[in-house]
Amino acid sequence: MELKTSYASDNYPIIVKHHAINSLERYIKNEEQRFFIIDKQVYNLFVDKLEALAQKFDAKCIVIPSGETSKSFEHYHRTIEYLLSHQLTRQTCIVAIGGGATGDFAGFIAATLLRGVSFVQVPTTILAHDSSVGGKVGINSEHGKNLIGAFYRPKAVIYDLDFLETLPYSEILSGYAEVYKHALLNGEKSTKNIESNFTSNKVLQALKNLDYYLFEGIKTKLNIVVEDEKEKGKRKFLNLGHTFGHAIEYEHKIPHGHAVMIGILYQFIVANHLFETNYNIQHYINYMKKLKYPLSIIKQLHFEDTYHFMLLDKKNDYNGIQMVLLKNLGKPVVTHVDKDTLLSAFEELQSYFK
């Protein structure tokens, strides 16, 4: 499966299939220098394959720590100085091979190196089906997640489904949260469809029909970001579950998608408090439990600590915290939420887990 973005210019292909890595050559063969920035776990799992690929294209491998730990200013500084020591020209290509954090980090390197060099995304996780598309790149600050960054489009996104076959279940759960989020944004039909396909942890672990839902998720995201690349309006809808999710992810260092799924649950409760919605919260809790999401951390949360990190969210303005909420499935809105409502919803969330 393949599709292409539809911006006014500078469009790029998104290739989703098994053995997609074979398409890499056409996007990097004309560059003078090539660097593969690779997630450590991915490198260890596919070392022979990746070293052979690097040798084929005369590329240097830079292996970085797995996950969010790589997205520090210190690691950025060390990596960019290493790259600059190679007397680079702008005919340099950075290839990100890893999950969402690797793509964020390598993309920010590419965006800032010599004011911008070529960049190819090779996502290796389910989670990265979301982050690799749309052009957001960046690193973290001590004040919060993704607060230092840029909008920078890749030359191509090459999504080789072969990489997904080695994912541990925790990573599958993390990625599925974003796939599920896209279904919620699409509406009731898409939500019922995905829930009826992934009915248990065993079905999800088998990745049944996953390629279809990944492709649908990518299309959903593209339909939004092509209209609003710089997140001035409707692109904010893609942050469904992320205001609360990012806060607990950053505070408790849990996997991104695990936190987002809890954030999705929380926004349903907030929506019930603010709007005339009547979401069946227990239904969503039961569904998450069927898939074996680790929800016990909800009991450990403290409102004031979580609220502090919610205040750092990039969607906020001088009027306070803004959240993406679903007025109905498929009908997202961005709205301010006062502290009292947030606290009341927080207390209700915890009440389900006593």
From Swiss-Prot:
Annotated compartments: Cytoplasm
Cofactor(s) required, per the database record: NAD(+); Co(2+); Zn(2+)
Pathway the protein acts in: Metabolic intermediate biosynthesis; chorismate biosynthesis; chorismate from D-erythrose 4-phosphate and phosphoenolpyruvate: step 2/7
Superkingdom assignment: Bacteria
Catalytic activity, as annotated: 7-phospho-2-dehydro-3-deoxy-D-arabino-heptonate = 3-dehydroquinate + phosphate
Ligand binding (Zn(2+)): E178, H242, H256
Cofactor notes: Binds 1 divalent metal cation per subunit. Can use either Co(2+) or Zn(2+).
Protein family membership: Belongs to the sugar phosphate cyclases superfamily. Dehydroquinate synthase family.
Protein known as: 3-dehydroquinate synthase
Naturally occurring in which organism (per UniProt): Staphylococcus epidermidis (strain ATCC 35984 / DSM 28319 / BCRC 17069 / CCUG 31568 / BM 3577 / RP62A)
Gene name of this polypeptide: aroB
